[in-house]
A protein has these predicted regions:
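Short, flexible helix-coil linker/hinge segments at the edges of structured domains or between repeats
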Residues: 100-121, 190-208
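Hydrophobic-face positions in mid-chain alpha helices that act as interaction patches
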Residues: 177-252
Length: 252
């Protein structure tokens, strides 16, 4: 829901700001300070910075630890990849979207590059946050494993996928495509065609095919409404089960 392209489908909850950050993103509400008001109460905000503190401890100290060099490089890479991921979540939830012309002056978020309880927090610009995210990813990717120890740790495909998404959010489409193609080189990941998978389920559970009609009633504007700049892509004519709102220019 970061960019307002896919979000919660319930009209009343969006319009009434039941979940403020979802509504802010969907409605592109850039009222000054509105996102920042929710940092104190947001579980996402506190948990991301808590995890970042742990990653900073690893980044600062792993090279001084005992053990094989390969293990140290792996720990460093995975910590930086996850630090980048958490900063990406934070900057897209609590700051303005990346716009090349204004990113250097748009207020971003606080960056903690080291674990230091005495250090005074500093707010960085959106551009500086994205630069730091990309710096971490570029450093991490060469040492990320093709297959991690378990699914809770980042893999090489994760690193490339996150890099692709960062490029996408910056509007760097060629770079996003190239990074995405690197993901598909993985032995352990592939693209799924969800439509035939859905139809296989419908064949076994026929009532599923009627659920999209109910979801369609939550549309914030009718499909033909001139104010509706979005297509309810997964609920139009193809019978897919869940309504994702996709901006018209994305489909065009």
């Amino acid at each position: 829901y970061f960019s307002g392209d896919a979000t919660w489908p319930y009209k009343n909850e969006i319009e009434n700001y039941k979940y403020p950050l979802r509504s802010i993103a969907f409605l592109w509400d850039e009222t000054e300070g509105l996102r920042q008001q929710h940092t104190v109460t947001s579980e996402l905000y506190s948990k991301c910075y808590s995890r970042i503190a742990n990653y900073n401890i690893v980044v600062e100290n792993v090279n001084d630890a005992e053990g094989p060099l390969a293990d140290k490089k792996l720990a460093m890479a995975q910590a930086k990849a996850m630090r980048a991921y958490n900063y990406f979540m934070l900057v897209n939830t609590f700051a303005k979207p990346y716009v090349k012309e204004t990113a250097a002056t748009d207020n971003g978020i606080i960056i903690h590059k080291k674990f230091d309880l005495e250090n005074e927090s500093k707010q960085y610009s959106v551009q500086e946050v994205y630069d730091f995210i990309m710096e971490d990813l570029n450093a991490a990717i060469p040492d990320l494993p093709e297959k991690p120890l378990n699914e809770f740790r980042p893999s090489l495909a994760f690193g490339w996928a996150l890099k692709a998404k960062v490029h996408l959010y910056k509007g760097e489409l060629d770079s996003a495509l190239n990074a995405g193609l690197e993901v598909l080189k993985s032995t352990y990941h592939k693209l799924w065609d969800m439509r035939p998978m859905y139809y296989d389920v419908v064949a076994e559970l026929p009532f599923m095919d009627f659920m999209s009609t109910g979801w369609d009633s939550y549309a914030i504007h009718p499909k033909a409404d001139p104010e509706n700049l979005l297509y309810q892509f997964c609920n139009n004519d193809n019978g897919e089960p869940f309504p994702f709102w996709i901006r018209k220019e994305t489909l065009d």
